[in-house]
Amino acid sequence: SLTPTVAIVDPALVLTVPGSVAADTGMDVLTHATEAYVSQMASDFTDGLALQAIKLVFENLESSVKNADFHSREKMHNASTIAGMAFANAFLGISHSMAHKIGAQFHTIHGRTNAILLPYVIRYNGTRPAKTATWPKYNYYRADEKYQDIARMLGLPCSTPEEAVEAYAKAVYELGERCGIEMNFKAQGIDEKEWKKHSRELAFLAY
């Protein structure tokens, strides 16, 4: 009964959103789309949505933040909805899981937290980490190869999965910086001692 029957996606509703909010939420959109695309639950039905959302973010987020023009705000509004359609069916990953736990503990902005985490999560996933749980069931790890798909679409170096992983992680980091986000937790007001004090618990909760 909580699920709406209609969603109104009207870019006029977001034209006055401050640039900082556009940056934070836009990077959240990018995280939604990226995690949906490399998810083990991804499918032919979600992949196209996720890739299109990523493309729209890289083409329009910076202008949406700095210029707040109708075209870029419309495209980012569409990207947000498209990414939502993707992750509602493919689910998300460890970046979002950690962002929720970090936000609850340190009261950080959700989208900004994802922006900071995402480059490191991309690099981690690119190492083909060992599976430590029984679900989801899969026989073939593919995140690194799917990052290569993303890098290829964006025109980034992608001759190998390893090269693509690093190129995409760097591109995400640089996009965040261009949008005015300080891409570290110290700038978000998290004390190093407090971070170390809670990091093990947060990692457990995120997992």
Where on the chain are the PLM-derived regions?
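Gly/Pro-rich interdomain helix-loop hinge
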Residues: 112-194
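Flexible, glycine/charged-enriched surface loops at secondary-structure junctions
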Residues: 40-49, 64-75, 90-95, 133, ...
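C-terminal and late-domain segments of enzyme folds
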Residues: 20-82, 86
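Metallocofactor- and cofactor-centric catalytic cores in central/energy metabolism, strongly enriched
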Residues: 60, 174, 178, 203
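Glycine-rich phosphate/pyrophosphate-binding beta-alpha loops
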Residues: 81-114
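A glycine/threonine-rich phosphate-anchoring loop and its flanking beta-alpha core
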Residues: 1-42, 128, 142-149
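Short, amphipathic C-terminal "tail helix"
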Residues: 192-207
